[in-house]
Each structure stands twice: as structure tokens, then as C-alpha cells.
Swiss-Prot record:
Higher taxonomy: Eukaryota, Metazoa, Chordata, Craniata, Vertebrata
Domain RGS: 333-448
Keyword presence, Membrane: yes
Processing after translation: Palmitoylated.
The keyword Cell membrane is assigned to this record: yes
Protein name: Regulator of G-protein signaling 7
Cellular compartments annotated: Cytoplasm, Cytosol; Cytoplasm; Cell membrane; Membrane
Gene Ontology MF annotations: G-protein alpha-subunit binding; G-protein beta-subunit binding; GTPase activator activity; GTPase activity
Region of interest (Disordered), residue spans: 235-256
Record's bilayer topology term: Peripheral membrane protein
Residues that bear Phosphothreonine: 243
Occurrences of domain DEP (ranges): 37-112
Length: 495
């Protein structure tokens, strides 16, 4: 019989611990009531042309029974409940691989208890290969493989090529046993076995109901962690649940513990969360913005002199004038301007012209402090304090009271990160005020436009210059012989 197939099955201990077991038990109680001889769903044999369809009932019979026996008023709710039970394989349509319930005359059949999901089946791919191979041996229209099943069979045949002979022999043996059964019994068992695999190897696009929710599994494996309330309170209804053993009484939380919990939840509320779509958009925009600066994707301009024999890069470095790409990059963000030495210099010149350079000078001094040897740190901390933060400092900066008080305490024990809070506050001020003014300033715009014009003029004259340089490097110049023509002598002198 079909029940004799040795599909993979878990032990009883694992079955009892399955998080889906409560749902299975409730569904099976309803199925047992459906199969009751007196008050259950009437099961009948239907004649169809020259054949008979044994042990079936219609989808409308299920919906009506659920409304009547489970006190369900809405037919849509009854249809939804029936669809969930069908998706778990407790009953199935006899002519469709999609396990769903329709409120019409579609014929359904109950699954045998041997194939119920409460038995915690874990069939392997070899079992599925034997089943599909057996289907191909039986010359029946109702047993023909669907498209996705044929693709699965071909994939399994490639995967188990070495032991396919054994799989074929096992399928052949099962097919011989099936032929010895009664015709009606064989028809019922074939449909039940097909429904079993429709649950465990569903049609593409359908949900696999046998998958275990990782959250439920974690709660079942660690019941003590999940039963404990965040606020130290015990739920009476949950504590009397048959699936949760009573836990020992815990002491009520102290005031300090409650304060810690409140602080923790406040931090969680303040956390900045982004949707995956927003993160993807941000990553795409960042990639598009920095595309021209990635030499793996686009050739750099100017090119690498070690690869192209073009000395434009060295000439620009010697002139200490930033390129157009370099100036344009300062506008991406304040970090880009501060990372570039020329960008820092231009930013500082602009702030000095507005008599507000103390913030940037303080930020640069703190960055320099982090790189100093440890023996120079205390003296350098005092110098920064006297210049920017002490009362009557020549270049006083504007700090909020909280940052100033914390920095005052840190100065008593000087270290490389004494001014960390003050530096962060100044950075935010520059990012929101000084940096936008620098980008909008005429100094930056003139520098950017000047680089664009110089870049265009360089493009117009570099073609001949490169040609002349290449000719001068590649063609040897020999002294002109006294008998050479004037034209050749003039050309030689020109080179």
C-alpha cells in the first residue's frame, strides 16, 4: 500500500516539540468531526461518463458544514478556514495540484491519517524521485506529470545520476505492488499520495505549509525566556496554558531595573530605521555619484602616467592646482572637502575671509591631537583649551552647556579624545552653516568654473601636444648631413 512507502519521518520527541503541533491537533479534531458517520460531511461515489469517482464530496459541502457546526456566520471566513486546512493536506481536490478550497461543485477527498502533517514527515529528494519515476511507469492519463514535476524529475535525475539505477528499481517494485491492488483502492491511494507530495513539494508559487516558523521554534526551545514578561509581570491565561509549564515565582523588579527598562525602550524608539527600498535607492544614488571616480569602471582623467605615458597627472600635481573632478567632489559633502588637503585649504581661506575660521581651526587641531605622540598630548590639550575654550580665549568657539561641562571634566585627565564631544558639536555646526555657505560662495563657484574652462582649453590643445611629444620620444633625431635637401634639413631642425 501507499502507506508502506518509507518516506523520511522524525522521531516522536521531535514531533511533540514541533511548534505547529497545536495547529495540527486543532485541525485534526475538526477533520474527525467532518468524517463522523452521523453529523459529518456526506461522502459519496459519483458516476462520470463510463467511470466512477469514489469517496468524494463537494467544496460547497465543506463550507456549509463549517458554517453549521463551527458557528461561523460569514461564508468568506468559512472558505478561508477550509482553504487553510486544504493547504495542510487534510483534504484535497481530486483533479488539481493547487491545494485550495472552492465554494462550488469541485470534488474533494479526505487524506488518509498516515499522510497527515502531524506525523512530522520530512521526505527526502530520493523519495520524491522514486515517486515521480513510478508515475512515469503507469500509463494513465490521471498520472501524467505536470510541467513542474517533469522539470523536477529531470533535475533529480541529474543530481542522483550515480544511484539512479537503484531509484528506478525501487520505483519499479512499488509500481508492481500497486498493480495488484483493487482498481478503486488504487485510484484513491494514488490521489492521496499525489496530495501528500503537493503539500511537501508544492506547485511553484504556492506556500509550503510544512516550513517551521523560526520565531515559534525559538519560543518552543527556550520557553523560559519567552514566558518572562519584560516588565516582570506574569500573564495568568498564558501560565495556565497546557503547553507552558509553570515557572517559579520571580521577584518584582526594583526601581532601578524599571528605570533601565524605560531607558532601553526610549533608545529603541529613537533608533533610526530605514526600509530596504530606501537603502537600495541610497546605495544606487551613491554609486551613480561616485561612478566617474572609480578607475575600475571608468578610465580616470587625467590617466595614470605609469600606464598611458601621459604626464598630465604629474603636471597637475606639480602645479598644486586641483582638477575639475577634484573641485566637483568637494560639493558631495563636507567630509570630501575635509579629506582633501587643497579642499581644507580653500575652505579655511573662505572662513578666514568671513572672520569665522575658529571652528575649523579647532576641528583641525583636535584631529592633529589624535595623531600626536602620547607624551605630547597633555601639553597640546592645554594649548587647545587656552586657545579655543578657556575664559577669554583669543579664538573662542560656541559650545552648548552640556558639551562644555563634559569637556571641562575631560581636561582634568587629558587624553587624545578629551575634546571628542566638543569636536562633534562643532562638526555639526559647520555642516549645517559654514559648509553650505562655502559651496554657495563665489570663491568656490569661480574655482569650479575656472577648472571647467581650463579643462576645455586643455582638451583642445592636448591632441597636438601629445602627438608632438610621442613623435619626439619615438623618432630618433640624427644630425643633418651636408648633402641633404633644405626641406629635410628644416624638418629635422623642427623636430
Amino acid at each position: 500500500m501507499a502507506q508502506g512507502n518509507n518516506y523520511g519521518q522524525t522521531s516522536n520527541g521531535v514531533a511533540d516539540e514541533s511548534p505547529n503541533m497545536l495547529v495540527y491537533r486543532k485541525m485534526e479534531d475538526v477533520i474527525a468531526r467532518m468524517q463522523d458517520e452521523k453529523n459529518g460531511i456526506p461522502i459519496r461515489t459519483v458516476k462520470s461518463f463510463l467511470s466512477k469517482i469514489p469517496s468524494v464530496f463537494s467544496g460547497s459541502d465543506i463550507v456549509q458544514w463549517l458554517i453549521k457546526n463551527l458557528t461561523i456566520e460569514d461564508p468568506v471566513e468559512a472558505l478561508h478556514l477550509g482553504t487553510l486546512m486544504a493547504a495542510h493536506g487534510y483534504f484535497f481536490p481530486i483533479s488539481d495540484h493547487v491545494l485550495t478550497l472552492k465554494d462550488d461543485g469541485t470534488f474533494y477527498r479526505f487524506q488518509t491519517p498516515y499522510f497527515w502533517p502531524s506525523n512530522c514527515w520530512e521526505p527526502e529528494n530520493t523519495d520524491y524521485a522514486v515517486y515521480l519515476c513510478k508515475r512515469t511507469m503507469q500509463n494513465k492519463a490521471r498520472l501524467e506529470l505536470a510541467d513542474y514535476e517533469a522539470e523536477s524529475l529531470a533535475r533529480l535525475q541529474r543530481a542522483f545520476a550515480r544511484k539512479w539505477e537503484f531509484i528506478f528499481m525501487q520505483a519499479e517494485a512499488q509500481a508492481k505492488v500497486d498493480k495488484k491492488r483493487d482498481k478503486i483502492e488504487r485510484k484513491i491511494l494514488d490521489s492521496q499520495e499525489r496530495a501528500f507530495w503537493d503539500v511537501h513539494r508544492p506547485v511553484p508559487g504556492c506556500v509550503n505549509t510544512t516550513e517551521v516558523d523560526i520565531k515559534k521554534s525559538s519560543r518552543m526551545r527556550n520557553p523560559h525566556k519567552t514566558r518572562k514578561s519584560v516588565y516582570g509581570l506574569q500573564n495568568d491565561i498564558r501560565s495556565h496554558s497546557p503547553t507552558h509549564t509553570p515557572t517559579p515565582e520571580t521577584k518584582p523588579p526594583t526601581e532601578d531595573e524599571l528605570q533601565q527598562q524605560i531607558k532601553y525602550w526610549q533608545i529603541q524608539l529613537d533608533r533610526h530605521r530605514l526600509k530596504m527600498s530606501k537603502v537600495a535607492d541610497s546605495l544606487l544614488s551613491y554609486t551613480e555619484q561616485y561612478l566617474e571616480y572609480d578607475p575600475f569602471l571608468l578610465p580616470p582623467d587625467p590617466s595614470n602616467p605609469w600606464l598611458s605615458d601621459d604626464t598630465t597627472f604629474w603636471e597637475l600635481e606639480a602645479s598644486k592646482e586641483p582638477s575639475q573632478q577634484r573641485v566637483k567632489r568637494w560639493g558631495f559633502g563636507m567630509d570630501e572637502a575635509l579629506k582633501d588637503p587643497v579642499g581644507r585649504e580653500q575652505f579655511l581661506k573662505f572662513l578666514e575671509s568671513e572672520f569665522s575660521s575658529e571652528n575649523l581651526r579647532f576641528w583641525l587641531a583636535v584631529e592633529d591631537l589624535k595623531k600626536r605622540p602620547i607624551k605630547e598630548v597633555p601639553s597640546r590639550v592645554q594649548e587647545i583649551w587656552q586657545e579655543f575654550l578657556a575664559p577669554g580665549a583669543p579664538s573662542a568657539i560656541n559650545l552648548d552647556s552640556k558639551s562644555y561641562d563634559k569637556t571641562t571634566q575631560n581636561v582634568k585627565e587629558p587624553g587624545r579624545y578629551t575634546f571628542e564631544d566638543a569636536q562633534e558639536h562643532i562638526y555639526k555646526l559647520m555642516k549645517s552653516d559654514s559648509y553650505p555657505r562655502f559651496i554657495r560662495s563665489s570663491a568656490y563657484q569661480e574655482l569650479l568654473q575656472a577648472k571647467k574652462k581650463s579643462g576645455n582649453s586643455m582638451d583642445r590643445r592636448t591632441s597636438f601636444e601629445k602627438f608632438a611629444q610621442n613623435v619626439g620620444r619615438n623618432i630618433p633625431i640624427f644630425p643633418c648631413h651636408k648633402n641633404c635637401t633644405p626641406t629635410l634639413r628644416a624638418s629635422t631642425n623642427l623636430l
